[in-house]
Amino acid sequence: MNKLRSSAITQGVQRSPNRSMLRAVGFNDEDFNKPIIGVANGYSTITPCNIGLNKLALKAEESIRRSGGMPQKFGTITVSDGISMGTEGMKYSLVSREVIADSIETACNAQSMDAVLAIGGCDKNMPGAMIAIARMNIPSIFIYGGTIKPGKLHGEDLTVVSAFEAVGQLTSGKINEKRLIEVEKNCIPGAGSCGGMFTANTMSAVIEVLGLSLPHSSTMAAEDLEKELSAEKSAEILVSAIKKNIRPLDLMTKKAFENAISVIMAVGGSTNAVLHILAIANTAGIDINIDDFERIRQKVPVICDLKPSGKFVTVDLHNAGGIPQVMKILLNAGLIHGECKNIEGKTITEYLQNIPDKPPSNQNVIRGIDYPLYKKGHLAILKGNLAKEGSVAKISGVKNPVLTGPAKIFESEEDCLKAILNNEIIAGDVVVVRNEGPVGGPGMREMLSPTSAIVGQGLGEKVALITDGRFSGGSYGLVVGHIAPEAAVGGNIALIKEGDLITVDAVKQLIEVDLSDEELEKRKNNWVKPKPKYKRGILSKYSKIVSTSSLGAVTDL
C-alpha cells in the first residue's frame, strides 16, 4: 500500500494536536496507520429516496472497520425533486448537484482522507458524488440507496409519475377525484428512489457501468436485504482498492463513458443522463461531447421495456438480470468495450463471464439485440436554428417523432401548466417554455408537471414541448429539452413569437423555427437581456458561473 494521504494529519511530532482531535472521536494508537475513509452520507427524512441510507451507512462503516480502515462519517444534502417539482424550489435541484460535489470534496480534502464511500439516493446525489470523486481522484466507491418497489392499485403497477399524470387526467375528465387520491396514496409504498428508469435509476446504472459501484447493485430494491449486504461488500472492496491503489480516473476513460452512454440508450434512460455524463466527463478531463450521444444512439437499440414509456419498473429489470445482463448482450454485439475495468480491478469481459448470453426466457423486460423495442436509441440530439449548440429529445414511446406546429409560448413552467390544465393546448401545438435554462431559471427546472399533464389529457402523441429547461426522468412524449444557447443569454428560443411555425424532427435530428436568418437577426437586435431574477443567495451565485447545458451546466470550467 502506498503512503497514506492521511499521514499529513496523523504522522510526526508536529501533528500531535491533530491526533488529539482524532483521539477524541475514537482513534487509538494503532488506528493512525490505517486508511481514513470518508463516508459521505446523504441520509434525509425529506424524501423516500434517502430515508433508508443510514442503515447502509452503518453497514458500510462496520465493514470498513472489519477490513482495516477507519470510517469517518459526514453528511451531505439532498433535494427531493418529487416534492420540489412544479414549484420555485425545483430551481435548487440541479444546483444541489454542485453543492453535493463541493461538500464531499471539501470534507475529504480538508481532512486529508484516503478514500471516500459515498451513499446517495435522489437524482442529483449520484452525479454530485461522481463529480467530487473525479475531482479528488482518491480511491472511491458509490453505494446507491436502491430503487423503490412499485405501488399497487387494483393490480396495476404505479410510480410517482402516475400521480403527476393523474392531475392531467382529472382536469380532462378522465378520472374523478377519488381515483386521484387513490393513486396519491398508493403510488409510493416505501423507501427507495422513483421506480421506473427515471433519473436516479439511470444515474445509478451509469455509475455501475463506469465501474465505481458493484455489479447488480444499481437495480436492487432499497428495502431488500441484498442492498445491505451489497453495502458491506462495497466497503470491503473499497479497502482493497486502497491497497491496490485503484483510483477513479483509472476507470473513468473515454471508452468507459461510451459504455455508459450505450447502456443508457439500451435501457431507455433519462435525458438528464446527457447533462450529468457531460459534467462528470468534463471533471474527469475526458473528451465527451453532446455529439457522442447521437453517434452512439445511431447504433445502440433500446432493448429494455421500462417505465416511463414502457411497461416495467426497475425491480423487474433487476429480477431479469439487471445491468450486467444488459451489458452482456451489448458486449456480445460489439456495442461496449470489454477491456474497461471496475473498482475490483476486473475487466468488463471478466466480471460478465458468468452472465448468460441471452436474457431469461420467462421475462419480457430485457429483449435480445435482434428484436429490440426500438432499433435506435431514444435520446436524440437535435440541432438547428433553435438549438445551434444542441438539444436533447426523448422519443421513446412516440410513434411519429416529427411535428410542425404553431408556437404556444410561456415564460415559466407555472404559466405553461396553468394553460394546459385550462385546456388551452390543442393537438398540433408546439409548447415553448423558455427562460428556464441554467442561467435563466436559474437552475434548469424539470418540466414533469407540464409533460405529465399533457400525457394525462391524451395529447402525448399530438403535442411537442420544447424548453431550455430539463425534463424529469419520468417525462415522455415528444419532448425536447436542454435547448442551447438558452433564452437568457440570447439564444434563438428567446426570439420566437406566438404562432411562429416550429418543426421538431427527431428523424432528421432537427429543431428549427420557420424564420429566415435575416428575421432572426432583426429580432435579436431588438432583444433585451432579462434582469437577473435573484440578487442574493445561491441561485444568484449559480446564475453567474454556470455553463451552457451543452457542456453539462458545470460551474468550474
Curated annotation (Swiss-Prot):
E.C. designation(s): 4.2.1.9
Pathway: Amino-acid biosynthesis; L-isoleucine biosynthesis; L-isoleucine from 2-oxobutanoate: step 3/4; Amino-acid biosynthesis; L-valine biosynthesis; L-valine from pyruvate: step 3/4
Name of the gene this protein is made from: ilvD
Tagged with keyword Iron: yes
Pfam families for the chain: ILV_EDD_C (PF24877), ILVD_EDD_N (PF00920)
Organism listed in the record: Prochlorococcus marinus (strain MIT 9215)
Reactions catalysed according to its record: (2R)-2,3-dihydroxy-3-methylbutanoate = 3-methyl-2-oxobutanoate + H2O; (2R,3R)-2,3-dihydroxy-3-methylpentanoate = (S)-3-methyl-2-oxopentanoate + H2O
HAMAP family: IlvD
Stretches assigned to coiled coil: none
Family according to the record: Belongs to the IlvD/Edd family.
Alphabetized UniProt keyword annotations: 2Fe-2S, Amino-acid biosynthesis, Branched-chain amino acid biosynthesis, Iron, Iron-sulfur, Lyase, Magnesium, Metal-binding
Entry protein name: Dihydroxy-acid dehydratase
Cofactor: [2Fe-2S] cluster; Mg(2+)
Active site residues per record: S472
Annotated function: Functions in the biosynthesis of branched-chain amino acids. Catalyzes the dehydration of (2R,3R)-2,3-dihydroxy-3-methylpentanoate (2,3-dihydroxy-3-methylvalerate) into 2-oxo-3-methylpentanoate (2-oxo-3-methylvalerate) and of (2R)-2,3-dihydroxy-3-methylbutanoate (2,3-dihydroxyisovalerate) into 2-oxo-3-methylbutanoate (2-oxoisovalerate), the penultimate precursor to L-isoleucine and L-valine, respectively.
Quaternary assembly: Homodimer.
GO terms under biological process: isoleucine biosynthetic process; L-valine biosynthetic process
Domain of life: Bacteria
